[in-house]
Amino acid sequence: MMATPNQTACNAESPVALEEAKTSGAPGSPQTPPERHDSGGSLPLTPRMESHSEDEDLAGAVGGLGWNSRSPRTQSPGGCSAEAVLARKKHRRRPSKRKRHWRPYLELSWAEKQQRDERQSQRASRVREEMFAKGQPVAPYNTTQFLMNDRDPEEPNLDVPHGISHPGSSGESEAGDSDGRGRAHGEFQRKDFSETYERFHTESLQGRSKQELVRDYLELEKRLSQAEEETRRLQQLQACTGQQSCRQVEELAAEVQRLRTENQRLRQENQMWNREGCRCDEEPGT
C-alpha cells in the first residue's frame, strides 16, 4: 500500500516534536488521545485500512457459518460482501454416469423373467420383515402366483363336449362325467404341452446366432431329403406288395370258382345216381 503525503510528513517529524505539538494545543480545543506508533515508524490506520478490517470481520463471521474466510472463493481483493460470496458458492449437481438399461417385461426371456420375479419377491419379503420388526402393519405380497398355485389341473375345457348324461341312471351319469373330465384333462395337458414347447423352441431360436441357424437349416434339409427317400421306398414296396396281393387274390378267386364248379358237377352226378338207384329199387318189386 502506498503512503500518503500526510503520512510521509508525520514520519519525517521526530517523536519529541509530536509530543510538544500535542501538549501545546489551544486551550479551548478538546484533547485528542495520543496516537500509538511503534518504534519502527509504522503508519497509523487509515480509513481504507479500517474498512478492510471490517470486511475481514464480516468474512470471519461468514466463516463461522461454515465457510473458510481465508479461501480465495470467499475473500476477493476488492472486498466482496457476504451475499456475493454466498451467491457465488453454489453446488452444481451433475447427472449420474451410471445408466440403467431398462427393458420391458414382455421383451425378456423366460429365464430373465424368472430372475426378475425372484428378485422382486426377495425384496418384498425383506421389506415386509423390516416393517414387521418395527411393528408396522404388513400387507400380503402383491403377486399373481397364488392364481397359478390355485389353478385346478383338471380344469374342464369348454371346447371339448362332455358325455351325455341320462337322468334315469345315476351310475351311468357319474361314469359319463368322469369320462368327460378325463378327456378334458387330457386335452388341457396336450394344449399346455404344445404351448410350452412352442415358447421354449422360440426362445432357443432367438438365442442362436446366424451361423447356427444356417447350419440347423441345412441339417433339416438333409433330414427332409432322407425322409422323402424313405417314403418313396415304402410306397414302392407297398405297391409291389399290393400287386402281389392282387395276384394272389385273383388266383384264390379262380380257385374258389373252380371248386364251386366242381362242387356243382359232383352234386349233379350225385342227384343222377340217386335217381338211378331209386329206379333200380322199384323194378324188382314190380
Swiss-Prot record:
Induction: Up-regulated by HMBA (hexamethylene bisacetamide) (at protein level). It is found in: Nucleus. The modification Phosphoserine is found at S29, S39, S51, S53, S71, S76, S81. GO terms for molecular function: 7SK snRNA binding; cyclin-dependent protein serine/threonine kinase inhibitor activity; identical protein binding; snRNA binding. The modification Phosphothreonine is found at T32, T46. Keywords: Coiled coil, Nucleus, Phosphoprotein, Repressor, Transcription, Transcription regulation. Residues 1-195 are annotated as: Disordered. Residues 207-277 form a coiled coil. Residues 140-143 are annotated as: Interaction with P-TEFb. GO terms for biological process: negative regulation of DNA-templated transcription; negative regulation of G2/M transition of mitotic cell cycle; negative regulation of transcription by RNA polymerase II. Ubiquitously expressed with higher expression in testis. HEXIM1 and HEXIM2 are differentially expressed. Residues 1-11, 68-78 have a biased composition (Polar residues). GO terms for cellular component: cytoplasm; cytosol; nuclear speck; nucleoplasm; nucleus. Residues 113-132, 178-195 have a biased composition (Basic and acidic residues). Homooligomer and heterooligomer with HEXIM1; probably dimeric. Core component of the 7SK RNP complex, at least composed of 7SK RNA, LARP7, MEPCE, HEXIM1 (or HEXIM2) and P-TEFb (composed of CDK9 and CCNT1/cyclin-T1). Interacts with CCNT2. Belongs to the HEXIM family. The coiled-coil domain mediates oligomerization. Transcriptional regulator which functions as a general RNA polymerase II transcription inhibitor. Core component of the 7SK RNP complex: in cooperation with 7SK snRNA sequesters P-TEFb in a large inactive 7SK snRNP complex preventing RNA polymerase II phosphorylation and subsequent transcriptional elongation. This is Protein HEXIM2. It comes from Homo sapiens (Human). The lineage of its organism: Eukaryota, Metazoa, Chordata, Craniata, Vertebrata.
